Amino acid sequence: MAAACTVSRGRLLIAAVVVLLIVGLSWGIGSAVAADGSASPAADGGKTVLRLGWTNDPDNLNPFIGYESSSYEIWAINYELLVGFRAEDYANVPDVGLATGWETSDDGKVWTFTITDQSRWQDGEPLTARDVAFTFNYIIDNELGMFVDYVKFIDKVEAPDDTTVVFTCSKPKANMLALWVPILPEHIWSKVDPSEVENKFKNEPPIIGSGPFQTVEWKKGEFVRMAANKDYWRGAPAIDEIIFLTYQNQDTMAQDLKAGHVQSAWNIPAAQFKPLNNEPDLESIRGVVIGLDELGFNCADKKKYPKSTGHPVLQDPAFRSALQYAVDKEKIVSIGYNDNANPGDSLLTRGFYDPDADFYWTPPADSAYTFDLDKARQALDEAGYTDGDGNGIREYKGKDIRLRLYARSESPESQKCGKLITGWFKEVGLDIDFQIIDDGALGDKQYNYEHGEFAPDFDMFIWGWGGDVDPNFILSVLTTGSIESWSDCNWSNAEFDELFLEQQTTIDLQERIALVQRMQEIVYRESPYIVLVYPLDLETANKGKWTGWVRAGNDQGLWWYNTQPDTYVAVHPEGSGSATAGGPNTALVVGVLVAAVAVGLVILRVVRRRGRRAETEA
């Protein structure tokens, strides 16, 4: 065997089955809290509890249904991966997931993994290679949409003994070490009807996994409570519980940070970034994350999808690419994101990858789309979209071009960007109907069906994607096969599809990089998306009274909300040592701090991973 990798046992983002789930607004229950930030909830016998604030409630705890990034965060510490990602550099290495080592055959088609014999399920049952084989075969045999692209080219998975699992592939599999598939307990999930797993099965707490924490309670719109797994095979977490508190108002969350009611918060208001950083004990960071926010077009082919309501001009790449010149990304960053983003261009995140393995494609300076309204007008003229009657609006087949643009009520950024884009597009001669709707309504429009036929009901939208460390996921979103599934723009390109398959089976890194970069170039020129920005996520933590915060991505990422367990396992009150040795803290009633607001709810960017809509709401 070749490419052996074995190390002695030592101690990320997002595709889903889109379901009709609208995050409900909740007027939260009040709670008595300790104001000094060093104490933790002690309603259950003095437990050390880490309280974290976020604005993005999980949509579903079933990993075959949920798609919000907050759901992924829960799964990342409730379950384990076969091969994990090292927090400091996101590298796939042994002993971060269940695998302690692996080997590949000379032809790259057979992968043999050795897994730890120390991990146990949170109900006490041993975790074995049979659970790993079951998880992957369950997905393969039932073609479960959320993970189906991860298992592409895997024919079968076998467990010859308790610590060995063998993957047999039809072709070499370049991303074999980067499969974000949570390993599930066979003794529980084998009883779940595959026909219901994508639409009915709720996976209600307590959720049995093998990770450092277990989800024991979830009140939608209020909180998620997770208990430490004291038998975690890499060592028990230093705390007893985590409470993820869902806020409907960012300013309230910021005030609770100042008061010490929460120890850290993700997606803090941009206006509060510096003030919070100036508070005693608090530190604020801007974290580089894998992801993008985009202006997407409904590119659905009217011949194949006659019920699509997308304007016909959006099928023309010349029309779409002309609009690239009509978007000022510097203003998008400064006005839309308060400078908490980097200008976007390519499909993969700039500045994220290792220089020796950089998949990002840089548009050549002499052919890059730069903001120039005159160039946009010229390109539209050359594409045949002119103003024939002199009313200031360009025409298609004698009728004014009127396009619907949707921004999300949950995202102030998308709303500000929508207003800017509406103004620029009007300046180049388009009639824009700008509307603000919620996530659920937008998802309904993107995955609309009329009498059983796919009928996407939109023209343009502003949303975003979270990605994986490996580029395969975000590339898969734009394949033809993902239409009616992960694709939200319904674009189809034969060369892109062919390259997508080829890069998956190209083991040589530099050869694969060349293929992936060519794919990005195609997307850039065809413009099914105009990539607006690579957002920076904002976090604040109480580093004065709590220690053990582990920042991911070579100190450029986040402390938490990064699908990495490191911070959750290590963080604890300053001077307490560990949860078992630190003793009780100041008494506090466990509750949820959710502001009661009827209008003007402010929730920052929601990164999502999308999948096909399930037939039945879970």
Please give the residue ranges for each predicted region.
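Ligand-site clamp/hinge motif
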Residues: 116, 201, 229-275, 422, ...
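Structural transition elements
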Residues: 343-388, 408-416
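Extracytoplasmic/peripheral linker and loop segments enriched in polar/acidic and small residues
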Residues: 109, 317-321, 325, 333-334, ...
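N-terminal lobe/hinge region of extracytoplasmic solute-binding protein
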Residues: 53-106, 137, 206-209
